[in-house]
Amino acid sequence: MIHLVLLSGGSGTRLWPLSNSTRSKQFLKVLRDADGNHVSMVQRVFGQIGSVDADIDITVATCSSQQESIRRQVEGGYALVLEPERRDTAPAIMLACASLALEQGAGTDDTVIVMPIDSYADQAYYDSVVRLDEAVQSDFAELVLMGVQPTYPSGTYGYIVPATGEGWP
């Protein structure tokens, strides 16, 4: 079985002044769906995942300040795991996995896929995400890291930006 964990805990201030510490970017309806309706990143991601596998088990790891925004934008069909306080990515993943194992009945042979709730990728990316289970279950891999080709280096996304100057290439 596949368990998809969507991470939604950041403050999402990259679109300031539209987004800020109380109104994260993933909830802003700045995108358009196939029908031309305004949707948020959260709604777009849920729609893309649902079009590939409507029955996939989804858990959203978030903080208490975002739970109502998520509930307003996406109706049911997922579990919410609330972080007691923001501690960044690794603790959020561990908390979600603990919830999957201890509260939601995930088995040791299940596949857990973790991704941000505000990813912006084309449909082919989401088609590939749900196929990761095939790689894991066939013993091709036990850990898979999947991403998109960056268009430029940016320190704000966690890329390493080398220094320049004397002694540096």
Whereabouts are the PLM-identified features?
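Proteins with a high burden of low-complexity, intrinsically disordered sequence enriched in S/T/G/P/A and R
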Residues: W16, G167-P169
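N-terminal glycine-rich phosphate-binding loop and ensuing alpha1 helix
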Residues: M1-I70, G76-R87, S99, Y126, ...
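Conserved beta-loop-beta/alpha segment of the NTase-like Rossmann-fold superfamily
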Residues: E75-E166
